[in-house]
Amino acid sequence: MSEVTKNSLEKILPQLKCHFTWNLFKEDSVSRDLEDRVCNQIEFLNTEFKATMYNLLAYIKHLDGNNEAALECLRQAEELIQQEHADQAEIRSLVTWGNYAWVYYHLGRLSDAQIYVDKVKQTCKKFSNPYSIEYSELDCEEGWTQLKCGRNERAKVCFEKALEEKPNNPEFSSGLAIAMYHLDNHPEKQFSTDVLKQAIELSPDNQYVKVLLGLKLQKMNKEAEGEQFVEEALEKSPCQTDVLRSAAKFYRRKGDLDKAIELFQRVLESTPNNGYLYHQIGCCYKAKVRQMQNTGESEASGNKEMIEALKQYAMDYSNKALEKGLNPLNAYSDLAEFLETECYQTPFNKEVPDAEKQQSHQRYCNLQKYNGKSEDTAVQHGLEGLSISKKSTDKEEIKDQPQNVSENLLPQNAPNYWYLQGLIHKQNGDLLQAAKCYEKELGRLLRDAPSGIGSIFLSASELEDGSEEMGQGAVSSSPRELLSNSEQLN
């Protein structure tokens, strides 16, 4: 094939609607457990949805450098489309054909790539468009793919677009409900339960949406009503991993930690390489320690050994999470709700000394900025912390965070010292040592929590040694800023 033809392919391929043009992953970086989760869904999903997952799996295989395996996944997708959507096979195959063209292009098999480009062109010509068409099922295909890759805002747009053409389509409605649920953590995007209820009405067998409705009702202080939906979903889909995982989250929030651990462990049986699940189980064990401390059980005879055992379980699962590839920054993010509950309510207590309030305002500010939950809330707490300290130097630090971090010149009482050390160990490949540093950083943040939860992460001597540091009122950088700074060292 001539160079001219190769150049023409390079102009055409970006016009194809498929995984290679949807910008699914930042810098083509895929989380280690995504392939496991996609394979799990292929095993448990209804046949009509499997083609979507095979297409995504093909793209993941390509990113891993395994293009032959990618082609096999595309063959599976093509066969399933022919079986399940024979009357719409050509249109439903457009995404698969686009993926074929891209994979063959990367393999250097340009004539094969051209064959699939021509297939797309022949189908799209019927709709007066050379290489792409507007079609609700294609929007839905992209929506499910974006959703699986964590791009919830884009998924929402895709499902909304599909519903404009077919407003009562059960699949489109379920997709929109799931996308909106995942966006619900952002205050400006909160929604009513009507979207989830409509999805259940149109798809009464979709047990995952029922669990999401249960979680939403729990947030609205209607836990008993929500639990009915969760129990029904577990009864009807006892092996569906997304149902089990979300139900575990419900029971963790409820405080039924043993039930949550049981459900998370059942999910691990199907996806044993999912570091996030190990992390969640570790958090449950930490919460069990907190429960015992809050009720005074930790002082009872024989319970000290149990406390130590629970702490060890928590540490073991946290370390296992890192061994399985969980990014420590993600673990830090997942603890946001836990951290806020434990020690970020300090600024609202009028009896707390001003110095302590100022520290807490700043930590709350950093946490909000990192999670992206609310810039307004972050700014508010940052300014309130400043007004308490009345120090111009602190104002400058919040207004303009430092852009460089000195290598290994920081004293141990410097802000976020252990967090930076953890990043360094992680970059050097020493995940276990990184985990220990992150635990100490969490302990530093939680040291003055009323429940004493900081003792999970720090020894008694470290708790005492750090008291002076906590009283200095130093302004800490947020995790995102620290990551940016650490990358500048390399």
UniProtKB/Swiss-Prot annotation:
Pfam families: TPR_12, TPR_7, TPR_8. Coiled coil: none annotated. The keyword Repeat applies. The keyword Repeat applies. GO terms for cellular component: cytoplasm; cytosol; mitochondrion. Expression significantly higher in peripheral blood mononuclear cells (PBMCs) and monocytes from systemic lupus erythematosus (SLE) patients than in those from healthy individuals (at protein level). Spleen, lung, leukocytes, lymph nodes, placenta, bone marrow and fetal liver. GO terms for biological process: antiviral innate immune response; defense response to virus; negative regulation of apoptotic process; negative regulation of cell population proliferation; response to virus. TPR repeats lie at residues 51-84, 94-127, 136-169, 172-206, 207-240, 241-274, 415-448, 450-481. SUPFAM superfamilies: TPR-like (SSF48452). It is found in: Cytoplasm; Mitochondrion. SMART domains: TPR. Belongs to the IFIT family. Component of an interferon-dependent multiprotein complex, at least composed of IFIT1, IFIT2 and IFIT3. Interacts with IFIT1 and IFIT2. Interacts (via N-terminus) with MAVS, TBK1, TRAF6 and RIGI. Interacts with COPS5. This is Interferon-induced protein with tetratricopeptide repeats 3. It comes from Homo sapiens (Human). The lineage of its organism: Eukaryota, Metazoa, Chordata, Craniata, Vertebrata.
